[in-house]
Design a protein with these regions (language model features):
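Structural marker of alpha-solenoid helical repeat scaffolds
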Residues: 14-17, 50-51
């Protein structure tokens, strides 16, 4: 997961992928979730939602919160 997170970090710094940043945050959130870092997962899902309210991160964030509660 660390390699995936590093690659996503690099892509997020690339301005040429501006239109896909919400998906990159969603994917990075998934990577953090699989790693067990729930705070980073939730933060990344929220970043994705802020960029695109229709992002699949909405459902992922809701499910993560349900699991944690």
């Amino acid at each position: 997961m660390d390699i995936a997170i590093k690659q996503l970090d690099q892509l997020l710094q690339d301005d040429s992928v501006e239109k896909d940043k919400d998906m990159l945050y969603y994917l990075r959130g998934n990577a953090y979730r699989k790693k067990g870092d729930w705070k980073q997962a939730l933060d990344n899902y929220q970043y994705a939602i802020d960029l695109n309210p229709d992002s699949p991160a909405v459902q992922a964030r809701t499910m993560a919160i349900d699991i944690l509660n």
